[in-house]
Design a protein with these regions (language model features):
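Short, cysteine/histidine-rich loop/knuckle motifs that typically chelate Zn2+
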Residues: 43, 57-60, 105-108, 112, ...
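Auxiliary Fe-S-binding modules of radical SAM enzymes
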Residues: 2-49, 246, 250-359
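Conserved AdoMet/S-adenosylmethionine-binding subsite of the radical SAM
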Residues: 130-290
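N-terminal [4Fe-4S]-dependent radical SAM core
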Residues: 21-40, 46-102, 116-120, 328-331
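Short secondary-structure boundary/capping segments
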Residues: 90-91, 190, 339
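Hydrophobic packing within well-folded, soluble alpha/beta domains
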Residues: 110-113, 178, 238, 350
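Extended interfacial segments that mediate partner engagement and assembly in macromolecular machines
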Residues: 68-156, 162-163
Length: 359
C-alpha cells in the first residue's frame, strides 16, 4: 500500500497540551510509538509513519514529541439538523431527525467531493470554537433529533470525538449513526461497532483504478470493512454515486451487486445516487436518470432486495416495497415520509419482517 503524504506543522502551531482557546488537546487512539520519536498511526489502512512535528495524511492528527494528538477533538466545523433520509438512511427511524456534525479533514481525496471545502481543509484553515461531547449531545436533544450523525467529512479521522459524543448521546437517549467511506482499520472499526446504531458506506466504485485515480484510496480495505460490518450485526446501507463514464458500466454494476449479495447480504439497502458536477470534476455532466434506473434493474436482477435511486426528486424508486408481497411499505417524496406501513418491524400487509432499525 502506498505511503502517506505528511504535512510539516506550521510555525506557531498550538503548544503541546493546549488549544488556542485553552481547551486541552486530546491524545489520539490507535497508534504505536516507533524509534526516533516517530509513531505509526493505526486508525486507517494508510498506516502513516509520522515524524515529530508532522501530521498524517488526514492533516488532523499530529506527532508532538512521540505522542499523537487529535487537532480536531471538540472542534466541529459543521452542525446541522437533517432528516435522516438525507444521509441517506432509508431503513433507520423513518421520518426522524439527525443532528449532524463534522470536523475538517479526510483520509481520502475524492475529486468529486461535494464538501471539499471542509474535507480537504486542515485545522489551520478553519478553527471553530470548542464544543464538548456533552454540549453536542445536549444540542441534539434540544433539536428534537433521534440520532447524532457523524457525516459531511470522514468521521474516522475524528474518531475520539465521535466516540465520546456517541457515549454522551447514549446517556441522553440519543443513538448514533455514521456516514463513512469505510476506509478504517479493523481495530478501530471493531471499537466503533458497539457505539453506533447504523453505518452508511459511500462505496465509490467497484474498480481499483477508480479508487486510486479518483479518490487517492484503495478498494480492498473498503471491501474488508464492509465484510466486517456484515458479520458484526450492525445495520448498514450502501450508497454508490454513479458518475457518467467512470463507474456507470453495466458490467461494473452487475459485478458490484453480485458481490454485495454473495459477500454481504441481499438485504443490504443499495442506493444509486445521481452525480452533479463538483470540485475537480465539473467537466462531467450530471448522471442521466435512466442510467440510475438501469443500475437499479441490474442490482435487482442480481438479487438485491432493496435498491433505491437518490438525488432525483419524485423518483418512484425512493419508496420501500415489501420484497415478499410487493405492498407499499414506505412512500417518500424527497426527504419526507408520506406513508409508513411497517408495524413492529414487519410489513403491515403480509406480516413478514423487514430488515432495518425501525423502533
Amino acid at each position: 500500500m502506498a505511503g502517506c503524504v505528511l504535512a510539516d506543522t506550521l510555525i506557531g502551531a498550538t503548544p503541546l497540551g493546549a488549544a488556542q482557546d485553552g481547551a486541552e488537546l486530546h491524545e489520539a487512539s490507535f497508534y504505536e510509538q516507533l524509534a526516533g520519536g516517530k509513531i505509526r498511526c493505526k486508525l486507517c489502512p494508510r498506516g502513516c509513519v509520522v515524524g515529530d512535528k508532522q501530521r498524517g495524511y488526514c492533516r488532523v492528527r499530529e506527532n508532538r514529541g512521540g505522542r499523537y494528538y487529535s487537532l480536531v477533538y471538540g472542534r466541529p466545523c459543521a452542525l446541522h439538523t437533517d432528516p435522516i433520509e438525507k444521509k441517506p438512511f432509508f431503513h433507520v427511524y423513518p421520518g426522524s431527525k439527525a443532528f449532524s456534525i463534522a470536523t475538517v479533514g479526510c483520509n481520502i481525496a475524492c475529486k468529486f467531493c461535494q464538501n471539499w471545502d471542509i474535507s480537504q481543509a486542515s485545522p489551520d484553515d478553519i478553527q471553530p470554537p470548542y464544543q464538548s461531547p456533552a454540549t453536542i449531545a445536549q444540542r441534539a436533544v434540544e433539536s428534537g433529533a433521534r440520532t447524532l450523525a457523524y457525516t459531511y467529512t470522514e468521521p474516522t479521522i475524528f474518531f475520539e470525538y465521535m466516540a465520546d459524543c456517541a457515549r454522551a448521546g447514549k446517556a441522553r437517549g440519543i443513538e448514533s449513526v455514521v456516514v463513512s467511506n469505510g476506509f478504517i482499520s479493523a481495530e478501530a472499526q471493531q471499537a466503533l461497532f458497539p457505539l453506533v446504531k447504523a453505518i452508511k458506506i459511500d462505496f465509490k466504485a467497484f474498480t481499483s483504478s477508480f479508487y486510486r485515480d479518483i479518490c487517492d484510496g484503495f478498494i480492498e480495505p473498503v471491501q474488508a470493512s464492509l465484510r466486517r460490518m456484515a458479520k458484526s450485526g450492525v445495520w448498514f446501507e450502501i450508497v454508490v454515486l454513479i458518475i457518467p463514464t467512470l463507474n456507470d458500466s453495466s458490467d461494473e454494476i452487475k459485478r458490484m451487486a453480485a458481490w454485495i449479495v454473495k459477500d454481504l447480504s441481499p438485504d443490504v439497502p443499495l442506493h444509486f445516487s445521481r452525480y452533479h458536477p463538483m470540485f475537480k470534476m465539473k467537466n462531467i455532466p450530471p448522471t442521466p436518470p435512466d442510467t440510475l434506473r438501469r443500475a437499479r434493474q441490474i442490482a435487482l436482477a442480481e438479487g438485491c432486495r432493496f435498491v433505491y435511486i437518490g438525488n432525483v426528486p419524485g423518483e418512484e424508486a425512493q419508496n420501500t416495497v415489501c420484497p415478499h408481497c410487493q405492498a407499499m411499505l414506505i412512500r417518500r417524496y424527497n426527504y419526507r415520509i408520506l406513508e409508513n406501513n411497517i408495524v413492529k418491524s414487519a410489513c403491515k400487509a403480509c406480516g413478514k419482517t423487514i430488515p432495518g432499525v425501525w423502533e
